[in-house]
Amino acid sequence: MKKISSPSFCIAKVIDEIVGYMEQNQGNNKSGIIRELHESNRLLPYFNKIESDYLDAGENLQSLISKLEQSDEVLGIEKSKMKELYKTFYSSESSFRRDLYKLTPRCCPICDAEWGYATHTLDHILPESIFPQFAILPINLVSTCYRCNHSKNSIVGYLESQGVLNPYFNSVNLLPYLKCYTYIKGDDFITHIQLKNESVVGLDPLKYKRLRFFYEEVYKLNEAYSEVARVSVLNSLIDTLSELGDVTNDFIKGDFQSLIMDDKEDLISKGVVTLEFLKVLVLESLQDLEVEAYDLINRMLQERRQMSEVQDIF
């Protein structure tokens, strides 16, 4: 997770647009209370204050939410109506949403999935279902992929050992901490992309717990990366090897080793979890397996070549 640029607009601009809309659409079910709060000079000062508190907490948002009480309303505005304000003023046609999307032009800042393979959404870092006061706050809205958004759902790290990571303030280079564990089940490989053990990563215990909470509990990246490794990376390796003709176990192992040595350090320095990096992790784990792993690879190669022959005839 790389740190990204903060939004170019603040809550005052959002409130200004909301107030202007409500003044022109007084039949709206939220118009009365919004105009009343605005005219009594309570609306903008309140949201300016929570934005300021959020920014002050910054990379330690857990310290902010530990002081907050959960509420079903904000200045008398029901939680459901705060959600409606978000849906209206951050709709797919909204300039606010477009501006936030521009902050992550290439990929999801959480899992590094590239757009085109993943779909943009806006994620409430502090969930609107729990903290409605942050529902329309720009600094609480991050452009992430659909999978990360819905994996997180309403999970919040209230404890110091859990924490809350927001890409506007925090960054984590996951690559040095990841390892692939592969084993054979039946006639297939099972892969798990997991965090290395605490004893070998060199982090203090609190940071390691926060990293594990982020990786496994909040965004479930272990599940996402493991699935990609099994379905995409392994299949791609088999496809590539199947085009080489007959290969020995020693050839396969040597080919794997050269790919690992050539790529790993450069990939880690970039700090992005790409297919190439996952491939290196898978190759490392395959090298740790016994000869039966290479026998299974050769059987898979034979099956893949037979499939290719059938496809060519078809």
Regions found by a protein language model. Give the residues of each.
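Short cysteine-rich loop/turn motifs with clustered Cys
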Residues: 96-120, 145
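C-terminal, charged low-complexity interaction regions
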Residues: 2-31, 202-314
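Soluble regions of membrane-associated proteins that transit the secretory/organelle pathway
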Residues: 4, 8-11, 36, 40, ...
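Extended hydrophobic/Leu-rich segments
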Residues: 47, 61-68, 82, 159, ...
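Glycine- and acidic-residue-rich phosphate-binding/metal-coordinating active-site segment common to enzymes
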Residues: 116-202
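Short Cys/His-rich Zn2+-coordinating modules
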Residues: 84-97, 123-130
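N-terminal accessory alpha/beta regions
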Residues: 1-93
